[in-house]
Design a protein with these regions (language model features):
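Amphipathic, oligomerization/interface secondary-structure segments
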Residues: 1-176
Length: 176
């Protein structure tokens, strides 16, 4: 029973933090994240192909194609994480580096995005029988720092003050 409660509260915590991150992303990048020209071109091609298929289809097939069309235009959690880390790691990166170093790991934002996305999807879709990705616990801690950083940044707080706040609130004890 306690294990079920731990799993339940763990999944809620995980989903809550990733949802908070996605909420902040929508505010930060209202038109979506910046994409490479190759990605934009590929998305345009797929969208046009799907539109053509949608116009020539009906019923369930059309519904599925319309759902797919919406997916093409939305950013993945992984790409959102990578963009934010590229744009704002100067604020929270030192905490991530330290956290991963303490665990004899190297921080890689690309891998972090993959793990968080995979684990979030497992929880969101009820795949609780899938093995928990252990390192994603560290990713989640760092994602909390990211969310906090983005929230404070949206209020115009200086980067050094955000770092001091993270240090104090999350008991990081880093010499900044």
């Amino acid at each position: 029973m306690v294990e079920d409660l731990d799993l339940y509260t763990g999944t809620l915590h995980y989903r809550g933090i990733t949802a908070a991150f996605e909420w902040e992303i929508r505010k930060l990048y209202p038109t979506g994240i910046r994409e490479s020209d190759a990605t934009i071109s590929a998305e345009k091609y797929v969208s046009e192909t799907l539109k053509e298929l949608i116009s020539n289809t009906s019923g369930k097939k059309k519904e599925i194609l319309m759902r797919l069309s919406k997916q093409v235009e939305s950013d993945s959690l992984k790409s959102e994480i990578m963009q934010v880390c590229k744009d704002y790691s100067s604020i929270f990166g030192c905490f991530g580096e330290h956290l991963f170093h303490l665990n004899d790991l190297e921080l890689n934002y690309n891998e972090m995005g993959e793990r968080l996305s995979s684990q979030r999807n497992n929880f969101a879709h009820g795949n609780l029988d899938k093995e928990f990705i252990g390192v994603s616990a560290l990713d989640l801690i760092l994602l909390e720092f990211v969310v906090y950083s983005l929230q404070l940044k949206s209020y115009g707080i200086e980067d050094t003050e955000i770092q001091r706040s993270i240090n104090e609130l999350f008991c990081r004890r880093l010499a900044l």
